[in-house]
């Protein structure tokens, strides 16, 4: 973390408060997330950072410079993070600059807003001191027979690019946001990873069914690689914002029925939306039994092997409204809200996020078992 940028980006009158917030956040992360090390474990996370770099901020105003430091502080506690909702790259590049030169990232191009993808990118961020990119990455494009039933009829403008037609009638479409897959390695652990931001649609009806179908399609399609990948010594990890409603909801069943496993340590992690009642974000595996057994033998605190970071536990709390009152009142939405303190609780999700990071701790050093096998002949 390049903390010297605080002197450059944070006005002197705000610096003491911002540094105090960073110290408080660091203390929280020390309590909740295991310390990074260079040998035994990989800390892997997924985080939907709301409207990062979006030019149209829906009337909530721009992110404050201090927020980039808070986001970077959270990201810095992991070795590898799949990030959703990265739009234009100006804010993202500020955050990665704060992280420092040891960090690298790869990303998709923006999705076409006309296709329902909101102009978003899917992104992988990784600490090069721990993770090696294996030079293969790509977006998943479904063959015609696997296209997703559309809950919304495409316009004539984009019918040719997103739908298969019979007698000029659309019968299917690609993902609203194309899943992004890549190969990485950390020590002995090789993994093929795919991140998603699944279409939300609605809470019921055809749009919910389209959401479920997107989950099924990516789990089935990516899961077909499992046998070959495991033979080659690679684990499959499917993660991101699935917009899964609950652990027993059919959105979750759509993921698990394809053979992916969500370890108990993750199933028992807190909900990742602000209201703490939805399990939108997930990390699922097709991997060796030993990898999952390691996750299941989790403890608490420094011994934890999965969790979710409550980003509003100590920052942007209701009690800190006065610190941000001027910024809140300066937004264009403020004119339409009489209760500024209630509006602030919504505004803060456009500063930090409306999702909590979900993370796991994976064992990546197989030296001992390898040497034992070698000695056994």
Describe the role of every protein-language-model region.
Residues 49-65, 167, 202-210:
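Acidic/histidine-rich helix-loop elements
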Residues 23-38, 181-187:
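Short amphipathic alpha-helices and their capping/turn segments at secondary-structure boundaries
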Residues 44-49, 74-93, 125, 182, ...:
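Active-site beta-strand/loop signature of hydrolases that rely on acidic residues for catalysis
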Residues 22, 82-189:
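Structured beta-strand-rich core segments of catalytic domains in phosphoester-bond hydrolases
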Residues 176-178, 184-220, 375-376:
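Metal-dependent phosphoester/phosphodiester hydrolase catalytic core
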Residues 67, 71, 88-91, 95, ...:
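Stable alpha-helical elements in mature extracytoplasmic
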Residues 1-31, 89, 224-235, 243-377:
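Metal-dependent phosphoester-hydrolase catalytic domains
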Residues 41-54, 135-139, 190-200:
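Active-site-proximal beta-strand elements of phosphoester/diester hydrolases
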């Amino acid at each position: 973390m390049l903390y010297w940028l605080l002197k450059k980006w944070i006005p002197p009158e705000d610096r003491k408060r911002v540094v105090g917030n960073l110290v408080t956040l660091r203390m929280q992360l020390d309590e909740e997330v295991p310390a990074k090390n260079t040998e035994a474990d990989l800390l892997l996370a997924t985080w939907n950072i709301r409207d990062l770099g979006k030019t149209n901020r829906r009337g909530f105003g721009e992110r404050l410079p201090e927020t980039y430091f808070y986001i970077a502080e959270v990201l810095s506690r992991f070795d590898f993070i799949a990030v959703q909702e990265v739009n234009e790259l100006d804010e993202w590049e500020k955050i990665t600059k704060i992280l420092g030169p040891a960090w690298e990232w790869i990303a998709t191009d923006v999705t076409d807003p006309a296709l329902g993808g909101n102009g978003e990118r899917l992104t992988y961020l990784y600490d090069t001191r721990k993770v090696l990119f294996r030079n293969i990455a790509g977006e998943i494009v479904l063959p015609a027979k696997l296209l997703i039933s559309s809950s919304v009829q495409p316009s004539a403008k984009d019918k040719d690019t997103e739908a298969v037609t019979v007698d000029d009638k659309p019968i299917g479409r690609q993902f609203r946001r194309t899943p992004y897959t890549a190969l990485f390695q950390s020590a002995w652990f090789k993994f093929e990873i795919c991140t998603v931001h699944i279409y939300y649609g609605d809470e019921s009806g055809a749009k919910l069914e389209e959401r479920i179908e997107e989950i099924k399609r990516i789990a089935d399609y990516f899961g077909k690689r499992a046998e070959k990948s495991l033979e080659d010594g690679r684990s499959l990890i499917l993660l991101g914002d699935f917009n899964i409603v609950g652990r027993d909801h059919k959105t979750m069943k759509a993921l698990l029925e394809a053979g992916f496993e969500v370890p108990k340590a993750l199933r028992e992690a807190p909900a990742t939306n602000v209201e703490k009642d939805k399990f939108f974000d997930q990390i699922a595996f097709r991997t060796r039994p030993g990898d999952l057994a390691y996750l299941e033998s989790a403890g608490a605190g420094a011994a934890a092997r999965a969790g979710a970071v409550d980003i509003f536990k100590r920052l942007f709390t209701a009690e800190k409204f006065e610190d941000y009152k001027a910024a809140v009142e300066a937004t264009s939405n403020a004119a339409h809200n009489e209760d500024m303190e209630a509006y602030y609780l919504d505004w803060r999700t456009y500063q930090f996020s409306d999702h909590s990071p979900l993370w796991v701790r994976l064992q990546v050093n197989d030296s001992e078992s390898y040497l034992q096998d070698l000695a056994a002949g």
